[in-house]
Amino acid sequence: VEPDVVPDVVVVGSANMDLVLPVQRIPRPGETVLAGLMTRGPGGKGANQAVASARAGARTAMVVALGDDEGGALLRDALEGVDLSLATTADAPTGTAIITVEESGENSIVVAPGANRELTLSADALATIGQAKIVLSQLEIPFSTVQAAAAASAYFILNAAPAAELSDELLAEVDLLVVNETEAEAIAGPDRSALLKKVPAAVVTLGGAGAVILTRDAEEIAVPGVRVEVVDTTAAGDTFCGVLAATLAATSANDSITASDLTNAVRRANVAASLSVQAAGAIPSVPHGDAIDARYAEVYL
């Protein structure tokens, strides 16, 4: 990271090459289906979220492990606008995700983590994490690395995806949890308000229905979704997380993110996600700040 430029947002996360297979429907166990034309492109929850944060206007750095291979080189190019001075090259191959996408836009994904399994935090990475306004992680990297990033952060957002059971020790370091309904249930069971026993604030995303904000000092706040024609849901959740982080970094002092700050940020993130599902692919579908702001004005102002 440039010595004088402290990033607003540091993403500690995964980067994958996505192999996308368009199918009429996702195969059931024991079933073989034929796909259309396979495409490959850059993705991974961390990379998608870092690009979303940068495009939304935040100075963004990424701590990531890439392979010394074609996929790693393509990802470095794809992470436009993201500071990669803390990226490391691992002995393992770059992570790969195999994504089947139905005509409806529904998808299923299998990830081979590769280099992402080897992501650890250097002293430089920890120092930068400690200075950033917002640090954002997901669960496609080792939990020990997530825990170390959380412990070093001023304000730590965990997108607990893919769904997993998390230790209370890790959750104790989380300032804001972002989960979908499946992930929320994995952590706190069917009653989502139980999340607040584990974290001080949470955003539960509801797909096209928007999101709800849970905080300990306010009633549950529902933020309705933005109705759009869905082309491809890949990276919608990642766009949401990256734009949420970027917006919180721009609107709040570190120590006092309020329910109204969260509401504003979730609205902007909702708008960004609604734009991303109208385009195909992961990183290619992530919107830029001017498009987000124009649509935000139409929807909310």
Description of each model-found segment:
Residues 17, 29-33, 37-40, 52-134, ...:
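Conserved N-terminal subdomain of the carbohydrate kinase-like
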Residues 1-8, 165, 192-301:
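Conserved phosphate-binding/catalytic region of the ribokinase-like
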Residues 133-193, 201, 209-211:
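Conserved beta-alpha-beta core of the PfkB/ribokinase-like small-molecule kinase fold
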Residues 81-82, 114-120, 156-163, 223-224:
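Short gly/ser/thr-rich secondary-structure transition/capping motifs
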Residues 18-30, 212-223:
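Acidic-glycine-rich active-site phosphate/pyrophosphate-binding loop
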Residues 9, 59-60, 84, 156, ...:
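Hydrophobic anchor at the start of a short beta-strand
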Residues 1-27:
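Positively charged, low-complexity intrinsically disordered leader regions
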Residues 51, 76-77, 147, 151, ...:
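Alpha-helical segments flanking ligand/cofactor-binding loops in enzyme cores
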